[in-house]
Amino acid sequence: MKIAIIDATGHAGSLILKEALDRHLDVTAIVRNPKKLTVAVPFIEKDLYDLTTEDLVPFDVVIDAFNAPAGKEDMHQTSLAHLSEILTNTSTRLLVVGGASSLFIDPEKTTRMIDQVPEDAPFYPTAFHMSQALVHLKDTKGLRWTYISPAAFFNPTGERTGKYQLDDDFLHKNAQGESVVNMADYAIALIDEVLADKHENEHVSVVSQ
């Protein structure tokens, strides 16, 4: 199995890359600046928006760990739209490092987390554009995708415990009543899904135990 990780030098991407390498998987980093890589790994030096179908079809799985910069949060939508377009009608799977804003908080599935976030909140632009990106992803035909949301608190510095809960598209809490997951444990869950391929064309979530 050949795996590509887009933005493999970011917070989530670097931990996903480490998890894949620790499992001795065949992984390639797709980065704009390979000098930021801290491990020896094959890489493609290219901007996400310049990627083509020909670049990605050699891979069985493409992991989208792209994180839009501040002030350009709409790139969460445009970047995923670009990847969806070039992977449509191919056999390559697209796994997306998503956000918690798209998770439902009521049994009727009428309210998502984003629907309760004040528009003047500092994180609203990111939350909004990530949730909208998923809306459009769900409408894409001929694409093998999985969107994996972290818990409400996506902890970049928490230790790797090796434990997590994989759930549906609702906001879930751990045994302590907290919606939190460490990025290192999220990386485990994502690579587990890469290998298992159990949730194609589904929105799932990860929370700590």
PLM feature spans:
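Short, polar loop motifs at secondary-structure junctions
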Residues: 29-36, 152
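Residues in the short beta-alpha loop(s) of Rossmann-like NAD(P)-binding domains
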Residues: 9, 33, 100
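N-terminal Rossmann NAD(P)H-binding glycine-rich loop of SDR-like oxidoreductase domains
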Residues: 3-23
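Glycine-/Pro-rich loop/turn segments that contact NAD(P) or position catalytic residues
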Residues: 75-159
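Conserved beta-strand positions in the Rossmann-like core of class I SAM-dependent methyltransferases
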Residues: 4, 28, 146
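C-terminal substrate-binding/catalytic lobe of Rossmann-fold NAD(P)-dependent oxidoreductases
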Residues: 131, 139-209
